[in-house]
């Protein structure tokens, strides 16, 4: 943003432009080609679908059998969820967990009920469903000094269940804070001593990606690969999980082919070569928000919104001049296609698809007989996002580093969490009521927690790369300036509000005024995917290594049957 000029016909050659040096797309036409062959169902596909339905009936019988103990049922539910199959049995699982909830205190509160795995697993399953049950049940596993009993260390599966349960803690739950420290220490020790045991893979995975912070497809893919090692595994579940994963993968391949064709037709690679070409990575992110086949419409809409947001972010962050960025923010605020010719040519290439995407969603919803007010809420959220983008560029232009608190007042909006949350509701159907959108517009705990996680995680992993060029101030610089500390100290200190934000999200999921769980899950899942992609580096921007491997696993390589 070196030269302040006004342009209405595209940037003239004399205008100085920044470049972030983003690597090009690593996928090319890969998914367009693969979807062409996958779009037609084969006899093999039909046989697999028939097989899935037969296996589904067997599993349903297991869930509804009246002679199964509660302990066996909760273990069955856990396996079903980890294998990515719970969307097939939502009603059955809900009924069973309601029964567990009603008998929870009586059943698990007894001092002689000392099965740590049983108690911790039940606690986690209920908290996941939004039941605000007490963590006091774990006090019986502590000694007279309030410390967890050392003999628990021998129960590795129980320790692992307690570790996973501790990640659903809310503010003030000291017993779960102690549980997390206790289990983390001893599970690491277990790994060092037993690196090749049957439970080692599960423990190793949990320590890196706790279930609460992981998303379905990657949890399922991993659990399918290790499930056969455990003496409690059930072959019917494993067969169904493999079959289901591959069938869902084909659904995603077809959708990705459509999305990739849409993106290719927009020709951003040639029209806006400075921007990140990451439509496949966006789709991967959004399958983490909703992977189930029934969510095709919201998946398509949110992928398009996120992909276009990425382009507009790069216009603000990398390429635009101050006057052009004001024009773009003003155009987004007006949300009016008639002003298209007043914009710089390169800006038009992003502005028109943005308006078209929202208009198409609105038309589709109207044709389906659904209310369209959600589109208006999403537009307003996008307008606030553009205002925040503009404010950050003004800081850059003035070479101004705000205080950490001032930075967050803008950066929590520019993180995009609220806009993505609102947009994730838009195509969810009648469950996304006006009241749900109003609730989200008031920045509840779960939504604010998402914004904190996105913003601070992004700033930490992207700091080194972004410091190589003129860039808007990040949380790292602002924290260093406000507290006069090194960047290493800033990195460590910024983890604290991220931990707090996860507790906020957990608490928000238990709030009685929160909307239905299917909506809350979208917000939570946005954070889960980010936690996976931003593991040590920005796996969205720099997607040619680890992210490439993950996407290959998710969308290209089927599971051998």
UniProtKB/Swiss-Prot annotation:
Family (UniProt): Belongs to the terpene synthase family. Tpsa subfamily.
Location in the cell: Cytoplasm
Protein name from the UniProt record: Sesquiterpene synthase 1
Domain observations: The Asp-Asp-Xaa-Xaa-Asp/Glu (DDXXD/E) motif is important for the catalytic activity, presumably through binding to Mg(2+).
Source species of the chain: Thapsia garganica
InterPro entries per record: Isoprenoid_synthase_dom_sf, Terpene_cyclase-like_1_C, Terpene_cyclase_plant_C1, Terpene_synth_N, Terpene_synth_N_sf, Terpene_synthase-like, Terpene_synthase_metal-bd, Terpenoid_cyclase/PrenylTrfase
Lineage: Eukaryota, Viridiplantae, Streptophyta, Embryophyta, Tracheophyta
Binding locations of Mg(2+) 3: 458, 466
EC number of this enzyme: 4.2.3.13
